[in-house]
């Protein structure tokens, strides 16, 4: 196997016993942007195979993990096999919150992504669709002041995506972790300081 940029993270994940190299993307987001604090309640969307989940557990977080694909059990983690594009996705998650005595999540994280086609415009559009579904769930499950993080293939709809959802939050950042493939348009959009659904949607001049 070649020793290119991607393989460095592959072998690091093996050494550190992470289920995927994506764990280092989340570690970067935590260290650089402070997106979670130890012990917080976190909704993780797109969790399988569990690399991010392992990092969250290492930080003592209470995790509800969601994915359309199955995921091997991680002690202390609640897993829901669920398609977030379903109309009742938010309701299913709220039901689990009630069972788990979680009133609201401190953080909503998403590493969810559709299978890529290799057609940049199509992959971008699919990532925006998933991102919108994630943010709709965040509107119903995130506490005021909370943080939402969404993965997206950056493209011509990214600006509108940030504009549409950004007015529910105090601030945002866009970043590409070092563990992301250099040739990929993958970015993570971080929204800070959720103000709640009932907010002033007027355009500020």
Curated annotation (Swiss-Prot):
Top-level enzyme category: transferase
Compartment(s): Cytoplasm
Major localization class: cytoplasm
Cited HAMAP family: RNA_methyltr_E
Cross-referenced Pfam families: FtsJ (PF01728)
Active site residues of this protein: 151
GO CC annotations on file: cytoplasm
Gene: rlmE
Native organism: Thermoplasma acidophilum (strain ATCC 25905 / DSM 1728 / JCM 9062 / NBRC 15155 / AMRC-C165)
The reaction(s) this protein catalyses: uridine(2552) in 23S rRNA + S-adenosyl-L-methionine = 2'-O-methyluridine(2552) in 23S rRNA + S-adenosyl-L-homocysteine + H(+)
InterPro entries: RNA_methyltr_RlmE, RNA_MeTrfase_FtsJ_dom, rRNA-MeTfrase_E, SAM-dependent_MTases_sf
Protein name as it appears in the record: Ribosomal RNA large subunit methyltransferase E
Family matches, as PANTHER family: PRE-RRNA 2'-O-RIBOSE RNA METHYLTRANSFERASE FTSJ3 (PTHR10920:SF13), RIBOSOMAL RNA METHYLTRANSFERASE (PTHR10920)
Keywords of this entry: Cytoplasm, Methyltransferase, rRNA processing, S-adenosyl-L-methionine, Transferase
GO molecular function, one term: rRNA (uridine-2'-O-)-methyltransferase activity
EC number(s) from the headed UniProt entry: 2.1.1.166
Family the entry assigns: Belongs to the class I-like SAM-binding methyltransferase superfamily. RNA methyltransferase RlmE family.
């Amino acid at each position: 196997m070649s020793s290119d940029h991607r393989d460095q993270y592959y072998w690091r994940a093996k050494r550190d016993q992470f289920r995927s190299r994506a764990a280092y993307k989340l570690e970067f987001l935590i260290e650089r942007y402070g997106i979670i604090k130890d012990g917080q309640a976190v909704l993780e969307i797109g969790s399988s195979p569990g690399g991010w989940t392992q990092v969250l557990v290492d930080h003592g977080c209470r995790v509800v993990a969601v994915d359309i694909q199955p995921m091997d059990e991680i002690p202390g983690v609640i897993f829901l096999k669920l398609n977030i594009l379903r109309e009742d996705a938010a309701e299913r998650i709220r039901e689990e919150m009630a069972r788990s005595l979680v009133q609201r999540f401190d953080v909503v994280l998403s590493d969810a992504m559709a299978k890529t086609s290799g057609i940049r415009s199509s992959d971008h559009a699919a990532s925006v669709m998933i991102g919108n579904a994630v943010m709709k769930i965040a509107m119903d499950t995130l506490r005021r002041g909370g943080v939402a993080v969404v993965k997206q293939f950056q493209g011509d709809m990214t600006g509108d995506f940030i504009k549409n959802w950004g007015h529910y939050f105090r601030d945002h950042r866009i970043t590409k972790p070092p563990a992301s493939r250099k040739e990929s348009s993958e970015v993570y959009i971080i929204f800070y300081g959720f103000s709640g659904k009932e907010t002033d949607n007027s355009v500020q001049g």
